[in-house]
Amino acid sequence: MYGSRKDSSGSRTPERVSYSPSPSPSSYSTNSSQSSSGRSRVRTAARSVAGVFVACFTPPEEEAPHHSSSAFGGSDAFSSTSDVSGASDSTDGKRLHRSIYTVKSDSTHSKEPASIKFTMADINKATKNFSPVLKVGQGGFGTVYKGQLQDGTLVAIKRAKKSMYDKNLGGEFQSEIQALSKVEHLNLVKCYGYLEQGDERIVVVEYVPNGTLREHLECFNGNVLSLDSRLDIAIDVAHAITYLHTYTDHPIIHRDIKSSNILLTDKLRAKVADFGFARLAADAESGKTHVSTQVKGTAGYLDPEYLRTYQLTEKSDVYSFGILLVELVTGRRPIEAKRELDERITARWAMKKYTDGVAISILDPKLEKSDANGLALEKILELALQCVAAHRRNRPTMRRCAEVLWNIRKDYKEQLV
């Protein structure tokens, strides 16, 4: 992605496709100090639904004929056709207390976000004509290069595959870039500018040198992420997505929240990447509830309701965040095809263990099975279960997720004293 490392694990990164595990609905309190009887009720409710996750590659029963299946193999980064309909899921408090989720520029954020329209000459100079030595990532969307601007600023330059360009989407691309020009948050990778010329679509973003969350979970650098650090990362990501959903001039849906899109700084603070081509959400003031669009995303993280209805809302990001929470505490990828059948879909396996009262057995083996870790683990899984509810109406908002995680971290630190 936008870090300095390439994925050398040999594990196959989940492809961006249309199918994912589909947990059943659940809705209950997110109070981190919930009583044991309350937890029992949660487990009972969850136990009744934990076994009905569908296999991640089972196609939906009905498919809309006007949606092209070719969209499922690539990124949402460079193409989407959409229309808007319905009334907003959650508008309470929208754009209130904006200062909580914004940050003033510092030395690493010296440029105005997305304010520059680069030329091809600028890009060629920054990447030394797309030198293979400077390539730091590759995926369905295209290739990412490390580059340096004239003033010495290090950047990541994301170049789309030529096959993903669609001249009919030029206006939409430009309108979304303009919306993103107003986005600035400490936990979001900054978008410095872009290029749209002929069959080239390129975005220039902040360079974050310490690799991805996925790499750190697999200990590529030899260091184990503590549960304390994992909670910090979860909160950082929750704040970033809350900002996109609630505190921007127009709500933005990330649409591809996953561990390989979370970059870490030298101090292990998280920055959400790959939001430069996210979808603009339905505008609450217009009375719309969702954006209808082709399904794009990554296997294992995809919202089953979005997959079934083609209706995209902020709650699709909440579902992906729930999968990310499970990934954080287990250390496993969302889909691990080489494991035993009942463990291949990590969220299904983890929720089954949680509802059976043996949540500690799914804790990342690199972490200590202490009382404090076990208690925090159960609370995190409780929140994750709500996030992956099959119906979006039963999922919390990202702001609520951030609040719950703050309480979990507070309680966890008190346990450690």
Each predicted region: which residue ranges?
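A positional/structural detector of protein chain ends, strongest at the extreme C-terminus
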Residues: 1-4, 415-417
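Detector for long, low-complexity, acidic/polar
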Residues: 2-109
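Conserved eukaryotic protein kinase-like
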Residues: 84-417
